[in-house]
Amino acid sequence: MTQRVFQVWKGSNKFILGGRLIFGPDARSLPLTLLLIIVPVVLFCVFVARHLRHEFSPYNAGYAIMVVAILFTIYVLILLFFTSARDPGIVPRNSHPPEEDLRYETTVSADGRQTPSVQIPRTKEVIVNGVSVRVKYCDTCMLYRPPRCSHCSICNNCVERFDHHCPWVGQCIGLRNYRYFFMFVSSSTLLCIYIFSMSAVYIKILMDHQQATVWRAMKESPWAVVLMIYCFIALWFVGGLTAFHLYLISTNQTTYEKLRYRSSHSRSIVYNRGCPNNFLEVFCSKVKPSRNNFRAFIEEEPPRVITLPSTTRESGEAEDENVTRRQKVEDDLDIGDDLMNLSRRCNAEDANNNQPHHTLDIDHERAGSIRTEARHESWGRRSGSWDVAATDVRESRSYATAKDGRG
């Protein structure tokens, strides 16, 4: 059965609706984020906004307080969805290393054997805005990362313009969702300010109606106090995050670049086009389409053959030929040794029986070519070095010459 891309995806992402929505592996944190947004708004509508409906006349303008809170919350949730449920800019991984960047090297072992090997350069230089930038090779995705791209260890993907991995949205923040992430954080900041302000207004109204002190008014509406405390604490996080990313956008940096290259001034100015253009690039440029079609069917890739360079291939063929020749010399020497031992044994038996041996009678011419010296240590070797002693080669040649002379 043919499978789709999302079914065999090698990253750690989670897909729903047949690969139409993509989340990070920690998407289970999303319900907590939803509760932190929805619960305070519900409490605000029930215990604060409901009592302010008739406080602003004419035209019952107090109803607008509740409507604004609800619409603002829906807007924040939509931004959260766009941030966490879409491709952040994942670079498609390769099934094999890029052939145009392969380097073929030959290593020589201790016994003289040459072994060809394939190497991948760890880095290479590219030019960005007239500045040389070093990009790294990713062993997991088997590709050279584009500039400003980094590999997320949580999602196990290379992400373009990688900013960071946010556990609150359960997704990487990259090229295709950074705009929505910033809008989500900044809108959450405004929502906190709105709820805090309206809760404070409600306490002020209670003070005016009852001619009471602030402490008595707070006692009359404890939920308003709880909402003010909650929003004050949340503002330190989302408000600080909004301010930090405003600075990053103005200088066209990412969180990853700011933390890693904080001491490199040249790195920070490579992509800086000026504050107005930097904001236009983030908020007004068209969002690039995804480079992955997660619902596409997988096509079987034909077998891949790596062709070694001619020099490597010729050296390998020469090595095989030398090995064959050495093996032949060793085999010839072993056969000659066995024949000599057989001849000695037969002559000894004939001498004991006082009978001439006709089939293995050795004439004087042939006797000179048979070796009677001690057995060399290189004879009979089956493993180890392929080197053959020079004396063995000379004796083999002399034996072959004598044999040809008799023929």
From Swiss-Prot:
Per the record, membrane topology reads: Multi-pass membrane protein
**What's a Pfam family this protein contains?**
DHHC
Main subcellular location of this protein, as a coarse class:
membrane
Give the Gene Ontology MF terms in alphabetical order: protein-cysteine S-palmitoyltransferase activity
Q: Where is this region: Disordered?
A: 348-368
The transmembrane residues are: 29-49, 62-82, 181-201, 224-244
Q: Which residues form the DHHC domain?
A: 136-186
| Entry's Gene Ontology cellular component terms | plasma membrane
Q: Where is the composition biased (Basic and acidic residues)?
A: 358-368
Q: Which UniProt keywords apply?
A: Acyltransferase, Cell membrane, Lipoprotein, Membrane, Palmitate, Phosphoprotein, Transferase, Transmembrane, Transmembrane helix
Give the positions the UniProt entry annotates as the active site: C166
Question: Which transformation does this protein catalyse, written as a reaction?
Answer: L-cysteinyl-[protein] + hexadecanoyl-CoA = S-hexadecanoyl-L-cysteinyl-[protein] + CoA
Which family is it part of? Belongs to the DHHC palmitoyltransferase family.
For this entry, the protein name equals Protein S-acyltransferase 8
Query: Could you tell me which species this protein originates from?
Result: Arabidopsis thaliana (Mouse-ear cress)
Q: What lineage does UniProt assign to this protein's organism? A: Eukaryota, Viridiplantae, Streptophyta, Embryophyta, Tracheophyta
Q: Per UniProt, what is the name of the gene that codes for the protein in this document?
A: PAT08
